[in-house]
Amino acid sequence: MNVIVSNSSDVPLYMQIKEQIKDAILKGELEDGELLPSIRNFANDIQVSVLTIRRVYEELEKEGFAVSQAGRGT
């Protein structure tokens, strides 16, 4: 999954990331049951705060796009 963020955008970083993940899910680029990257690794890969990715994952879960399982990830 290729996520691109822009610090100069008016759209908050977490929303940019969340929308790109949702698009990947809706387009079938991410399959049902496929694990998302760990929060720490994903944050490092796209150079954003761990808190930003945590918020993205929490919102995706609230919206029904992700399920978090203890010990397995999101």
Please give the residue ranges for each predicted region.
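N-terminal helix-turn-helix
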Residues: 36-67
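Minor-groove-contacting beta-hairpin "wing" of winged helix-turn-helix DNA-binding domains
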Residues: 38, 72-74
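Residues at secondary-structure transition points
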Residues: 8-12, 16, 51, 63, ...
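Extreme N-terminal segment that seeds HTH/winged-HTH DNA-binding domains in transcriptional regulators
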Residues: 1-35, 41
